[in-house]
UniProtKB/Swiss-Prot annotation:
Protein name as it appears in the record: Caffeoyl-CoA O-methyltransferase 3
Enzyme class: transferase
Superkingdom in the source lineage: Eukaryota
Expressed in which tissues: Mostly expressed in petal limbs and tubes, and, at low levels, in stems, roots and leaves.
InterPro entries in alphabetical order: Cation-dep_OMT, SAM-dependent_MTases_sf, SAM_O-MeTrfase
Cofactor details (free text): Binds 1 divalent metal cation per subunit.
Pfam (any one): Methyltransf_3
Organism, as annotated: Petunia hybrida (Petunia)
Induction section of the entry: Circadian-regulation with peak levels occurring at the end of the light period in flowers.
Gene: CCOAOMT3
Amino acid sequence: MAENGASQETTQVAKHQEVGHKSLLQSDALYQYILETSVYPREPEPMKELREITAKHPWNLMTTSADEGQFLNMLLKLINAKNTMEIGVYTGYSLLATALALPDDGKILAMDINRENYEIGLPVIQKAGVAHKIDFREGPALPVLDLMVEDKSNHGTYDFIFVDADKDNYINYHKRIIELVKVGGVIGYDNTLWNGSVVAPPDAPLRKYVRYYRDFVLELNKALAADPRIEICMLPVGDGITLCRRVS
């Protein structure tokens, strides 16, 4: 019986990893319990609608998980964020979680290279009455950030910055946005456990995109741990999120 149980558990883990769940929990049942007990019953209707729309999109694994969306929404309220930035938007699930958490005069500078994906969620965002908080910019974020850093009046003006974009540029983003977030403000980097691949052996059967970006994620994690300007906390929420509180 023990052997059979172990075999079933191994199969479950293999299936979990194969479908690329937006959770690092090795038990699908436990993750489902979290969703059904804590997340879905309290999920705002606009977020539920956008989550269900996004689930039909072929790139839906790019979206922020529902539990991470809930976490971001509460975090923003706890820190009383008002001026925020998001790098990497996709259909806007995390953007909507942010917009719903901000006061009516709150602002989000949102950047993504694909406006078409953003427009999938835009009708939901508009219906939720929070579109006026969002300044969406289509195109690469680095040129925009460079211009912002050049203007000293932008330094230390952001309460919260969320990065969920091209992992090979995370270090480049950090070099710039650390100047833009205020002392006491927070930066959130998504996917910092990267499908659990950060601890995978060299011969692990990783998907090509997971293997390609793995070293960039490891580089970021090492850099954040050594950066004296921030306090950090890495959490196994979604695909891993690292919160950085600027202290100097």
